[in-house]
Amino acid sequence: MNEQSPALRNFTINFGPQHPAAHGVLRLVLELDGEVVERVDPHIGLLHRGTEKLIETKTYLQAMPYFDRLDYVAPMNQEHAFCLAAERLLGIEVPRRGQLIRVLYSEIGRLLSHLLNVTTQAMDVGALTPPLWGFEEREKLMVFYERASGSRMHANYFRIGGVHQDLPPKLVDDIDAFCDPFLKVVDDLDQLLTGNRIFKQRNVDIGVVTLKQAWEWGFSGVMVRGSGAAWDLRKSQPYDVYAEMEFDIPIGKNGDCYDRYLIRMEEMRQSVRIMKQCIAKLRAPDGQGPVLITDNKIAPPRRGEMKRSMEALIHHFKLYTEGVHVPAGEIYAAVEAPKGEFGVYLVADGTNKPYKCKIRAPGFAHLQAMDFLCRGHLLADVSAILGSLDIVFGEVDR
């Protein structure tokens, strides 16, 4: 309410869900004083599918595809968290080649996510060329997904104890051949946006988050690194073969939209660095071997064995009808997903289905801060701030 006259009221508008900058099904109710944002009220739940409840009625193997449908921009990163949780409860070690393939595909997922975010963030502030370049590269990466798993998006490729099948040698060569030309595309995007006067005016000093605020709001990933903390689960709590990988963690110093953009650009370069190391290790003698654990109580036996051995046939039948029995216990497993810390809190009761599977989506904590981030900014800045948060509604609404 304005001080001077009771007749002057704030103006309320709906931003989305049909808005092009609303990234899916976001609905923001904005309260404006002129063109200055006074209050932002995000309305969520338009993509709610009851994932956590559905997982309780499915076996551990059947629950896997639900994770692809959370952050559907980088699907395999979520499967990773669920697999890690179940593996820790089972107390099993994934074969080295399986770990390498997982890390390789997690980094491909990071590229998929950052490419989409950086280019659509640019589109939200008016640059129309980057999305066209970004989608061309994403297309190539999705073909790599398809060649590994048979599906472009909802891969369902990771398994408890490794991955579903080995990569063909030609695919490893093609991923290797993709890396260097891709860095050139990142440089082209860099040239187009980083020094661009309009892009900087729209992003510098917009949506500033101090490090203290980032911790208080429960931020993770790029949102924390943009404010100056070198916090990355791949370094601080390494999983699979990340401990062997050499890469740097880019951090910002201003905590604004521009810093977050720069970090995502640098993270793409670091991801390519990790991918190259994975490919070298996959080709090395110690990178050969099985991609899935050989325990037939957890992973299916090979087709050839099933034709010869009755035991293998029984194992196969039991595994796909009844599923894996995970020992009772509870565990929290988190991975450094492209959007932040994606965690799975898994409670097992000794049966073939999870008792409870709580999903900690990074985008949820970031979206709830929209009000605090946008207050005092102009209406046009709302889409710039939203673009830098990197929100996907599959994981927010679950």
Swiss-Prot record:
It is an enzyme of class 7 (translocase). Pfam families: Complex1_49kDa. The keyword Translocase applies. Its main location: membrane. InterPro entries: NADH_Q_OxRdtase_suD, NADH_UbQ_OxRdtase_49kDa_CS, NDH1_su_D/H, NiFe-Hase_large. It is found in: Cell inner membrane. It is a peripheral membrane protein. Keywords: Cell inner membrane, Cell membrane, Membrane, NAD, Quinone, Translocase, Transport, Ubiquinone. GO terms for molecular function: NAD binding; NADH:ubiquinone reductase (non-electrogenic) activity; quinone binding. One of its GO terms (cellular component) is plasma membrane. It catalyses: a quinone + NADH + 5 H(+)(in) = a quinol + NAD(+) + 4 H(+)(out). Its EC number is 7.1.1.-. NCBIfam families: NuoD, PRK06075.1. NDH-1 is composed of 14 different subunits. Subunits NuoB, C, D, E, F, and G constitute the peripheral sector of the complex. NDH-1 shuttles electrons from NADH, via FMN and iron-sulfur (Fe-S) centers, to quinones in the respiratory chain. The immediate electron acceptor for the enzyme in this species is believed to be ubiquinone. Couples the redox reaction to proton translocation (for every two electrons transferred, four hydrogen ions are translocated across the cytoplasmic membrane), and thus conserves the redox energy in a proton gradient. Belongs to the complex I 49 kDa subunit family. This is NADH-quinone oxidoreductase subunit D. It comes from Bradyrhizobium sp. (strain ORS 278).
